[in-house]
UniProtKB/Swiss-Prot annotation:
Gene3D superfamilies per the UniProt record, alphabetical: 6.10.250.900
Name of the gene this protein is made from: npy
Record organism: Typhlonectes natans
Job of this protein: NPY is implicated in the control of feeding and in secretion of gonadotrophin-release hormone.
Stretch forming the signal peptide: 1-28
GO molecular function terms attached to this record: neuropeptide hormone activity; neuropeptide Y receptor binding
Modified residues (Tyrosine amide): Y64
Tissue specificity field: Expressed throughout the brain with highest levels of expression in medial pallium, basal forebrain, preoptic area, midbrain tegmentum and trigeminal nucleus.
Pfam families referenced in this protein's UniProt entry, alphabetically: Hormone_3
Entry protein name: Pro-neuropeptide Y
Signal listed as a keyword: yes
Family, per entry: Belongs to the NPY family.
Length: 97
């Protein structure tokens, strides 16, 4: 009886934490601006196009992660297992001379 109660309590806790995590992820993404309609005044259309431009810039911007960090690139070069994959400078290439 007590084992069954613990199982249901852990399932309930996991489900609630999963729902909270999914809710925060859904709020993090920007929402598309509402279209004011075809017969809207020029000021509303200008605001809509400005908001739409901002929305498009947000969702299409480039995102840079840890791989572009110079410190991680140096550590990858130092701790790599084989030396075959290390990029060579173009001056080491015999065809350049």
């Amino acid at each position: 009886m007590q084992g069954s109660m613990r199982l249901w309590l852990s399932v309930l806790t996991f489900t609630l934490s999963l729902l909270i995590c999914l809710g925060t992820l859904a709020d993090a993404y920007p929402s598309k601006p509402d279209n004011p309609g075809e017969d809207a005044p020029a000021e509303d259309m200008a605001k809509y196009y400005s908001a739409l431009r901002h929305y498009i810039n947000l969702i299409t911007r480039q995102r840079y992660g840890k791989r572009s960090n110079p410190e991680t690139m140096v550590s990858d070069v130092w701790w790599r297992e084989s030396t075959e994959n290390i990029p060579r400078s173009r001056f080491e290439d015999p065809s350049m001379w």
